[in-house]
Amino acid sequence: MKQPGTIYEAIGGFDTIDTLVTAFYTHVGNHPKLIPIFPDDLTETARKQRLFLTQFFGGPKWYTEDRGQPMMRRRHLPFEITPERRDAWLACMDAALNETKIEEPYHTAIFEKLTMTAHHMMNTPYK
């Protein structure tokens, strides 16, 4: 049996990313700490997240093809990302990972990679 070469392949590819992002933005759209920094219509935000996570976890480089180099910190600088919002974002992602039923060791690997990224995105101290 061939072992998957990437997290993307191991979790089932784009269909799983799509399910994860859909679940995630359902939580984001209802989270009082996150609503102020996200648009009312999350359609385009979710589309970009699908492209990013596909690439981030070893799938096709769709994000770069569509948007250029990720430069995620720079792209997020216009938004106040506090430790509190980082934690809210991670809580929404953890809930989405649970709902998507991504199995171990991939659930933990994904959450750890996204936790490091979320820490990197912080640009505003506690208020």
Task: Identify what each model region corresponds to.
Residues 1-127:
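Core of compact, soluble alpha-helical bundle domains
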